[in-house]
UniProtKB/Swiss-Prot annotation:
It catalyses: ATP + protein L-histidine = ADP + protein N-phospho-L-histidine. This is Sensor protein VanS. Phosphorylation of VanR inhibited by EDTA. Member of the two-component regulatory system VanS/VanR. Functions as a sensor protein kinase which is autophosphorylated at a histidine residue in response to environmental stimuli, such as glycopeptide antibiotics. VanS transfers its phosphate group to transcriptional regulatory protein VanR, thereby modulating expression of target genes. Binds directly to, and autophosphorylation activity is enhanced by, the glycopeptides vancomycin and teicoplanin, in vitro. One of its GO terms (molecular function) is ATP binding. Autophosphorylated. NCBIfam families: HK_VanS_ACDEFG. It comes from Enterococcus faecium (Streptococcus faecium). SUPFAM superfamilies: ATPase domain of HSP90 chaperone/DNA topoisomerase II/histidine kinase, Homodimeric domain of signal transducing histidine kinase. It is found in: Membrane. Its EC number is 2.7.13.3. The modification Phosphohistidine is found at residue 164.
């Protein structure tokens, strides 16, 4: 996966000003230093060189003067320029050693991140932009670590809950099968009743085992999409038909409000899983003898699908329902409780489709809304 980073301009003005002032100071100091030295040795340097030429090389005064004139005095500007350059290089080396402290500060800040120390990262005033970035990164890493620990704790709690819930139907299955085994001459009606109860408990046990596998698979696989042209209206109708027995048992009804030609591009299996999870929650937490409204349609350049049911979700829980291993039913009811992965996976699937999912709730109703990118031909068709 290729991540494109935005070329965001950062404010390094303080550092730039300091660097500029250092450069100006180096040039000025080098020039002043060379000119000062020149003024100090003016006249003295010539006499000293003439003395060496006359005494060490046995030159007469006139020859020594000519050699000094042609070799040194006529090239004095070059010597001055060379001296200035050398001075600048020396001062630059000193300046670089001063600037090295900024890298030391950054390294210290990175060490704080690596060692996860509980303290703020502090840099020089000129590095305030980098200081803010490092502290932001530190807070982000700390939050991710806390979220990971919280998710792991929830996962452990869910595993414990499911282990407890598995024991309940398993105990019932063993009990009823023992009765059937001990009383082969049991009346047919009673035997049929026990078999029916045992079968229901076995189905529940299968569901809980599937939840265990769901927990195992969640962090081991990446959601991949196989997109195709989907008849969204037909998918919603088929889904509500499948939920009819579960809904009718409590006097509930799912009503679809959507155009029959509504289509969308996506992975049919993954989207069906999303809608099934939402409807499953609506069926589990809505009031008896109520209607679950499913409204779908084109809104601008997105296809919107809403599930509205009676009942409310507290605000503190509403903000967390899309987190993995989060369960609304704190009592972990064996009939409605799950691993808390349904809505978390639903969100991942919708995000993979380039859409979004969110929930709203008031005192009377709860609404889950899914928005998916509309196909261009559908948008053009509705506009024409």
């Amino acid at each position: 996966m290729v991540i494109k980073l935005k070329n965001k301009k950062n404010d390094y003005s303080k550092l730039e000003r300091k660097l500029y002032m250092y450069i100006v100071a180096i040039v000025v100091v080098a020039i002043v230093f060379v000119l000062y030295i020149r003024s100090m040795i003016r006249g003295k340097l010539g006499d000293w060189i003439l003395s060496i030429l006359e005494n060490k090389y046995d030159l007469n005064h006139l020859d020594a003067m000519k050699l000094y004139q042609y070799s040194i005095r006529n090239n004095i500007d070059i010597f001055i320029y060379v001296a200035i350059v050398i001075s600048i290089l020396i001062l630059c080396r000193v300046m670089l050693s001063k600037f090295a402290k900024y890298f030391d500060e950054i390294n210290t800040g990175i060490d704080v991140l690596i060692q996860n120390e509980d303290k703020q990262i502090e840099l020089s005033a000129e590095m305030d932009v980098m200081e803010q970035k490092l502290n932001t990164l530190k807070r982000t890493l700390e939050k991710r670590e806390q979220d990971a620990k919280l998710a792991e704790q929830r996962k452990n709690d869910v595993v414990m809950y499911l282990a407890h819930d598995i024991k309940t139907p398993l105990t019932s299955i063993i009990g009823y099968l023992s009765l059937l085994d001990e009383a082969p001459d049991m009346p047919v009606d009673q035997k049929a009743k026990y078999v029916h109860i045992t079968l229901d408990k076995a189905y529940r046990l299968e569901q809980l085992i599937d939840e265990f596998f769901e927990i195992t698979r969640y962090n081991l696989q990446t959601i991949t999409l196989t997109k195709t042209h989907i008849d969204l209206y037909y998918m919603l109708v088929q889904m509500t038909d499948e939920f009819y027995p579960q809904l009718s048992a409590h006097g509930k009804q799912a009503v679809i409000h959507a155009p029959e030609d509504l289509t969308v591009s996506g992975d049919p299996d993954k989207l069906a899983r999303v809608f099934n999870n939402i409807l499953k929650n609506a069926a589990a937490y809505s009031e008896d003898n109520s209607i679950i409204d499913i409204t779908a349609g084109l809104s601008g350049d997105v296809v919107s699908i809403e599930f509205k049911n009676t009942g409310s979700i507290p605000k503190d829980k509403l903000a967390a329902i899309f987190e993995k291993f989060y369960r609304l039913d704190n009592a972990r009811s064996s009939d409605t409780g799950g691993a808390g992965l349904g809505l978390a996976i639903a969100k991942e699937i919708i995000v993979q489709h380039g859409g979004q999912i969110y929930a709203e709730s008031n005192d009377n109703y709860t609404t889950f809304r899914v928005e998916l990118p509309a196909m261009p031909d559908l948008v053009d068709k509705r506009r024409s």
